Amino acid sequence: MLREPMNQHDAPGPAETGADSDAETDAETDAETDAGAADDRYRLSHNSQIGTVLRDLAWQKCMLSVRTRTAHQFVTSILHVDPVNRTFVFDWCNAEPERMSLMTSEENAFSGLLRGVPVNFVVGQPAATRYDDGPAFVAEFPEKLYHFQRRRHFRARTLVTKGYRCEMSLPDKTVLGLDIADLSLSGVGLRSRTVTADHLPVGTTVAKCRLDFRELGKLELDMQVVGHWLVGRDDSAIHHFGCAFVNPDGRMENFLQRLVFALELAHRG
Protein backbone atom coordinates (compact mmCIF):
# COMPACT_ATOMS: atom_id res chain seq x y z
CA MET A 1 0.00 0.00 0.00
CA LEU A 2 1.20 3.51 -0.73
CA ARG A 3 1.52 5.51 2.47
CA GLU A 4 0.65 8.98 1.20
CA PRO A 5 -2.60 8.97 -0.78
CA MET A 6 -3.37 12.49 -1.93
CA ASN A 7 -6.63 14.30 -1.17
CA GLN A 8 -8.65 11.53 0.44
CA HIS A 9 -12.30 11.27 -0.67
CA ASP A 10 -14.99 8.86 0.45
CA ALA A 11 -17.49 9.55 -2.34
CA PRO A 12 -17.68 6.44 -4.55
CA GLY A 13 -18.24 6.52 -8.29
CA PRO A 14 -21.78 6.19 -9.62
CA ALA A 15 -23.10 2.66 -9.83
CA GLU A 16 -22.27 1.56 -13.32
CA THR A 17 -22.58 -2.16 -13.86
CA GLY A 18 -19.22 -3.10 -12.37
CA ALA A 19 -15.99 -2.79 -14.26
CA ASP A 20 -16.12 -3.17 -18.00
CA SER A 21 -15.23 -6.70 -19.11
CA ASP A 22 -11.61 -7.36 -19.93
CA ALA A 23 -12.24 -7.68 -23.67
CA GLU A 24 -9.01 -6.09 -24.74
CA THR A 25 -7.89 -6.18 -28.33
CA ASP A 26 -4.52 -5.16 -29.74
CA ALA A 27 -5.98 -1.75 -30.49
CA GLU A 28 -7.05 -1.36 -26.90
CA THR A 29 -3.81 -2.41 -25.29
CA ASP A 30 -1.77 -0.19 -27.60
CA ALA A 31 -4.13 2.78 -27.34
CA GLU A 32 -2.49 6.07 -26.47
CA THR A 33 -4.02 7.55 -23.35
CA ASP A 34 -1.78 10.26 -22.07
CA ALA A 35 -1.06 12.50 -25.03
CA GLY A 36 -0.48 16.15 -24.25
CA ALA A 37 -3.24 18.74 -24.14
CA ALA A 38 -5.34 19.29 -27.27
CA ASP A 39 -3.79 22.55 -28.41
CA ASP A 40 -1.92 24.04 -31.35
CA ARG A 41 1.08 21.79 -30.74
CA TYR A 42 -0.86 18.90 -32.27
CA ARG A 43 -2.97 20.74 -34.83
CA LEU A 44 -2.12 20.25 -38.51
CA SER A 45 -3.63 22.75 -40.94
CA HIS A 46 -1.50 22.47 -44.09
CA ASN A 47 -2.97 20.25 -46.79
CA SER A 48 0.32 18.42 -47.26
CA GLN A 49 0.47 17.51 -43.57
CA ILE A 50 -3.18 16.47 -43.46
CA GLY A 51 -2.77 14.42 -46.62
CA THR A 52 0.23 12.61 -45.16
CA VAL A 53 -1.69 11.54 -42.05
CA LEU A 54 -4.74 10.49 -44.10
CA ARG A 55 -2.52 8.41 -46.40
CA ASP A 56 -0.90 6.77 -43.38
CA LEU A 57 -4.34 5.92 -42.00
CA ALA A 58 -5.25 4.34 -45.34
CA TRP A 59 -1.93 2.49 -45.67
CA GLN A 60 -2.17 1.08 -42.14
CA LYS A 61 -5.84 0.16 -42.70
CA CYS A 62 -6.72 1.93 -39.45
CA MET A 63 -10.29 1.67 -38.20
CA LEU A 64 -11.94 5.04 -37.60
CA SER A 65 -14.99 5.89 -35.55
CA VAL A 66 -17.33 8.39 -37.23
CA ARG A 67 -19.87 10.39 -35.24
CA THR A 68 -22.41 12.52 -37.08
CA ARG A 69 -24.00 15.70 -35.84
CA THR A 70 -27.10 13.73 -34.81
CA ALA A 71 -24.93 11.38 -32.72
CA HIS A 72 -25.14 8.39 -35.07
CA GLN A 73 -21.92 6.36 -35.03
CA PHE A 74 -20.28 3.73 -37.19
CA VAL A 75 -16.81 2.37 -37.96
CA THR A 76 -15.05 2.91 -41.29
CA SER A 77 -11.61 3.05 -42.90
CA ILE A 78 -9.95 5.30 -45.48
CA LEU A 79 -9.65 3.67 -48.91
CA HIS A 80 -7.93 6.33 -51.02
CA VAL A 81 -6.47 9.84 -50.65
CA ASP A 82 -6.29 12.39 -53.49
CA PRO A 83 -3.85 15.14 -52.40
CA VAL A 84 -4.27 17.08 -55.66
CA ASN A 85 -8.02 17.55 -55.27
CA ARG A 86 -7.76 17.45 -51.46
CA THR A 87 -10.34 14.68 -51.07
CA PHE A 88 -10.36 11.23 -49.53
CA VAL A 89 -12.54 8.15 -50.01
CA PHE A 90 -13.75 6.08 -47.07
CA ASP A 91 -15.67 2.86 -46.71
CA TRP A 92 -19.44 2.61 -47.17
CA CYS A 93 -21.92 2.19 -44.33
CA ASN A 94 -24.63 -0.44 -44.90
CA ALA A 95 -26.81 0.64 -41.97
CA GLU A 96 -29.36 3.05 -43.39
CA PRO A 97 -29.94 5.28 -40.31
CA GLU A 98 -26.20 5.93 -39.91
CA ARG A 99 -25.70 6.35 -43.66
CA MET A 100 -28.51 8.87 -44.03
CA SER A 101 -27.36 10.77 -40.96
CA LEU A 102 -23.83 10.98 -42.36
CA MET A 103 -24.92 12.19 -45.79
CA THR A 104 -27.11 14.94 -44.37
CA SER A 105 -24.72 16.05 -41.62
CA GLU A 106 -22.44 19.03 -42.17
CA GLU A 107 -20.23 18.06 -39.24
CA ASN A 108 -18.84 14.53 -38.97
CA ALA A 109 -16.15 13.74 -36.40
CA PHE A 110 -13.54 11.07 -37.17
CA SER A 111 -11.35 9.55 -34.47
CA GLY A 112 -8.93 6.67 -34.41
CA LEU A 113 -5.40 5.50 -33.72
CA LEU A 114 -2.38 5.71 -36.01
CA ARG A 115 0.44 3.52 -34.66
CA GLY A 116 -1.08 3.87 -31.21
CA VAL A 117 -1.41 7.67 -31.40
CA PRO A 118 -4.85 9.36 -31.40
CA VAL A 119 -5.96 11.17 -34.56
CA ASN A 120 -9.07 13.40 -34.63
CA PHE A 121 -10.61 15.53 -37.37
CA VAL A 122 -13.98 16.83 -38.56
CA VAL A 123 -15.25 16.92 -42.16
CA GLY A 124 -18.31 18.34 -43.82
CA GLN A 125 -21.07 16.59 -45.73
CA PRO A 126 -19.70 13.73 -47.87
CA ALA A 127 -20.99 12.45 -51.19
CA ALA A 128 -21.59 8.94 -52.50
CA THR A 129 -19.04 7.58 -54.97
CA ARG A 130 -17.65 4.31 -56.34
CA TYR A 131 -14.33 2.75 -55.45
CA ASP A 132 -13.05 -0.64 -56.63
CA ASP A 133 -16.51 -1.42 -58.06
CA GLY A 134 -18.18 -0.85 -54.71
CA PRO A 135 -20.06 2.00 -53.01
CA ALA A 136 -18.04 4.44 -50.91
CA PHE A 137 -18.05 7.99 -49.58
CA VAL A 138 -15.87 10.89 -50.67
CA ALA A 139 -15.22 14.00 -48.58
CA GLU A 140 -13.00 17.05 -48.72
CA PHE A 141 -9.92 17.27 -46.51
CA PRO A 142 -10.64 18.62 -43.02
CA GLU A 143 -9.55 22.19 -42.34
CA LYS A 144 -7.50 20.93 -39.41
CA LEU A 145 -6.43 17.58 -38.03
CA TYR A 146 -5.15 16.73 -34.56
CA HIS A 147 -2.34 14.19 -34.45
CA PHE A 148 -1.24 13.74 -30.85
CA GLN A 149 2.37 13.03 -29.99
CA ARG A 150 3.41 9.79 -28.40
CA ARG A 151 3.35 9.54 -24.66
CA ARG A 152 6.21 11.16 -22.79
CA HIS A 153 5.97 8.89 -19.78
CA PHE A 154 5.69 5.22 -19.04
CA ARG A 155 2.10 4.01 -18.82
CA ALA A 156 1.01 1.39 -16.28
CA ARG A 157 -2.07 -0.63 -17.10
CA THR A 158 -4.52 -1.56 -14.38
CA LEU A 159 -6.08 -4.91 -13.58
CA VAL A 160 -9.74 -4.74 -14.55
CA THR A 161 -10.67 -6.89 -11.55
CA LYS A 162 -9.47 -4.16 -9.17
CA GLY A 163 -12.37 -1.88 -10.07
CA TYR A 164 -10.41 1.39 -10.07
CA ARG A 165 -12.79 4.23 -10.90
CA CYS A 166 -12.86 7.87 -11.99
CA GLU A 167 -15.70 10.19 -11.03
CA MET A 168 -16.27 13.47 -12.88
CA SER A 169 -18.75 16.21 -11.99
CA LEU A 170 -19.71 18.28 -15.04
CA PRO A 171 -20.84 21.93 -14.88
CA ASP A 172 -24.47 20.86 -15.43
CA LYS A 173 -24.24 18.74 -12.24
CA THR A 174 -24.08 15.48 -14.22
CA VAL A 175 -21.80 12.95 -12.53
CA LEU A 176 -19.97 10.50 -14.79
CA GLY A 177 -18.26 7.30 -13.67
CA LEU A 178 -15.64 5.53 -15.79
CA ASP A 179 -13.19 2.68 -15.29
CA ILE A 180 -9.48 3.52 -15.09
CA ALA A 181 -7.59 1.58 -17.76
CA ASP A 182 -4.07 2.94 -17.28
CA LEU A 183 -2.06 5.72 -15.66
CA SER A 184 1.10 7.72 -16.38
CA LEU A 185 2.71 10.82 -14.90
CA SER A 186 1.01 13.00 -17.51
CA GLY A 187 -2.43 11.46 -17.88
CA VAL A 188 -4.92 8.66 -17.45
CA GLY A 189 -6.82 6.32 -19.75
CA LEU A 190 -10.52 5.85 -19.03
CA ARG A 191 -13.12 3.52 -20.54
CA SER A 192 -16.85 2.98 -20.39
CA ARG A 193 -19.68 1.32 -22.27
CA THR A 194 -22.13 4.09 -21.39
CA VAL A 195 -20.14 7.34 -21.32
CA THR A 196 -19.69 8.50 -24.93
CA ALA A 197 -18.07 11.35 -26.84
CA ASP A 198 -21.35 13.22 -26.47
CA HIS A 199 -20.71 13.38 -22.72
CA LEU A 200 -16.97 14.10 -23.01
CA PRO A 201 -16.02 15.70 -26.34
CA VAL A 202 -12.32 15.99 -27.11
CA GLY A 203 -11.05 19.28 -25.66
CA THR A 204 -13.31 19.21 -22.59
CA THR A 205 -11.62 20.23 -19.34
CA VAL A 206 -13.13 18.91 -16.11
CA ALA A 207 -12.10 20.26 -12.71
CA LYS A 208 -11.57 18.17 -9.58
CA CYS A 209 -11.84 14.72 -11.14
CA ARG A 210 -11.61 12.01 -8.51
CA LEU A 211 -9.45 8.96 -9.22
CA ASP A 212 -10.06 6.09 -6.81
CA PHE A 213 -7.33 3.43 -6.69
CA ARG A 214 -8.84 1.80 -3.61
CA GLU A 215 -6.10 0.57 -1.26
CA LEU A 216 -3.43 2.50 -3.19
CA GLY A 217 -5.00 5.90 -2.58
CA LYS A 218 -7.24 8.54 -4.12
CA LEU A 219 -6.47 11.63 -6.17
CA GLU A 220 -8.32 14.78 -7.10
CA LEU A 221 -7.06 16.87 -10.03
CA ASP A 222 -8.11 18.72 -13.17
CA MET A 223 -8.04 16.86 -16.49
CA GLN A 224 -8.55 17.56 -20.20
CA VAL A 225 -9.92 15.03 -22.69
CA VAL A 226 -7.36 14.78 -25.51
CA GLY A 227 -8.52 11.68 -27.36
CA HIS A 228 -11.51 9.39 -27.89
CA TRP A 229 -11.83 6.12 -29.80
CA LEU A 230 -14.04 3.05 -29.92
CA VAL A 231 -13.00 -0.56 -29.53
CA GLY A 232 -15.55 -3.07 -30.81
CA ARG A 233 -18.82 -2.54 -32.61
CA ASP A 234 -22.49 -1.97 -31.85
CA ASP A 235 -23.62 -2.87 -28.33
CA SER A 236 -20.25 -4.36 -27.41
CA ALA A 237 -18.30 -1.17 -28.17
CA ILE A 238 -16.17 0.30 -25.39
CA HIS A 239 -15.46 4.04 -25.39
CA HIS A 240 -11.88 4.94 -24.54
CA PHE A 241 -10.82 8.43 -23.44
CA GLY A 242 -7.28 9.73 -23.18
CA CYS A 243 -7.06 12.47 -20.55
CA ALA A 244 -4.12 14.75 -19.72
CA PHE A 245 -3.55 16.13 -16.23
CA VAL A 246 -3.72 19.92 -16.03
CA ASN A 247 -0.83 21.47 -14.08
CA PRO A 248 -0.30 18.88 -11.33
CA ASP A 249 1.93 20.21 -8.56
CA GLY A 250 5.22 18.66 -7.47
CA ARG A 251 3.75 16.74 -4.55
CA MET A 252 1.07 15.27 -6.80
CA GLU A 253 3.68 14.23 -9.38
CA ASN A 254 5.71 12.48 -6.69
CA PHE A 255 2.68 10.49 -5.59
CA LEU A 256 1.77 9.70 -9.21
CA GLN A 257 5.24 8.30 -9.77
CA ARG A 258 4.90 5.92 -6.84
CA LEU A 259 1.37 5.00 -7.89
CA VAL A 260 2.46 4.16 -11.44
CA PHE A 261 5.22 1.95 -10.01
CA ALA A 262 2.76 0.16 -7.70
CA LEU A 263 0.30 -0.44 -10.56
CA GLU A 264 3.03 -1.88 -12.76
CA LEU A 265 4.14 -4.26 -10.00
CA ALA A 266 0.54 -5.41 -9.52
CA HIS A 267 0.07 -5.88 -13.26
CA ARG A 268 3.19 -8.03 -13.54
CA GLY A 269 2.42 -9.83 -10.29
Curated annotation (Swiss-Prot):
PilZ domain ranges (all copies): 149-261
Subcellular location: Bacterial flagellum basal body
Region (Disordered): 1-42
Top-level taxon of the source organism: Bacteria
Biased composition (Acidic residues): 19-33
Keywords, sorted A to Z: Bacterial flagellum, c-di-GMP, Nucleotide-binding
Predominant cellular place of this UniProt entry's protein: other
UniProt GO cellular component terms: bacterial-type flagellum basal body
Keyword DNA damage applies: no
Disulfide bonds: none
BP term (GO), one: regulation of bacterial-type flagellum-dependent cell motility by regulation of motor speed
An example Gene Ontology molecular-function term: cyclic-di-GMP binding
Homology family: Belongs to the YcgR family.
Known role: Acts as a flagellar brake, regulating swimming and swarming in a bis-(3'-5') cyclic diguanylic acid (c-di-GMP)-dependent manner. Binds 1 c-di-GMP dimer per subunit. Increasing levels of c-di-GMP lead to decreased motility.
Record's subunit section: Monomer. Interacts with the flagellar basal bodies.
Protein name: Flagellar brake protein YcgR
